[in-house]
Amino acid sequence: ITEVSKISKNTLESNLYINFKISTNYKEREILYKQFLNEDWAKIDFPNLSVTDYLNNIKNASFILAPWGNGVDSHRFWEALYLGKVPITKHHHTYKTAKHLPVLFVNDYSEISKEILNNFIENFKDSYSWEVLSIQYWHDLIKKDYKDSETTYVIKESLFNAYVNKF
C-alpha cells in the first residue's frame, strides 16, 4: 500500500470501484453487484486479483464501495482512505469518529448514483483534510496536547499555591 500511495492521485471523479467477496455478506453484497453491473461509471472486479492490481485499481478510482462484511468495518474502508480515495459505506455508530474523514455515508446502498457522487465532489471535496490520515498529523496533535496539559498543570498549581498562600 505504501508504494502505491506514493503515486496515488488525489483528484476526484464520479467513478466507483467495486471489489469484494459476495459470500462474506451475501444478503447485501449480491444486490450491490447487480445494482452496479451495467453502470458505466462503476468498475466491478472479483477478488482474485493480485494485491498490486487491486491497489492500482483503487488508486485509479475516486470512490470505493466498502460494504459491511462479517462486521461493519472493512479493510476496504481503510485502504481507500490510505490511498486518498473516498470509501462509501452505510452509517453506523461505530463510524462516528470518522465524521471528519472524506467518507460518503449512506443510509442504504440504493442511494448511490452518479449524481450523489458528483454532489459529494462538488460540496465536500475541500471540506476534508487528508492530512488527518498521516502519522505526522497525530504526532503533532499528541505533542501539542501534551504541551497544553503541562501548561494547564503549571497554571493550576500556581493558582492553587497563590490561593493557599493567602491564608
Describe these PLM feature segments.
Residues 109-114:
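A short acidic, often aromatic-flanked loop/helix-cap motif at beta-alpha or helix-coil junctions
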Residues 1-105, 119, 123-167:
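Nucleotide-sugar donor-binding catalytic core of glycosyltransferases
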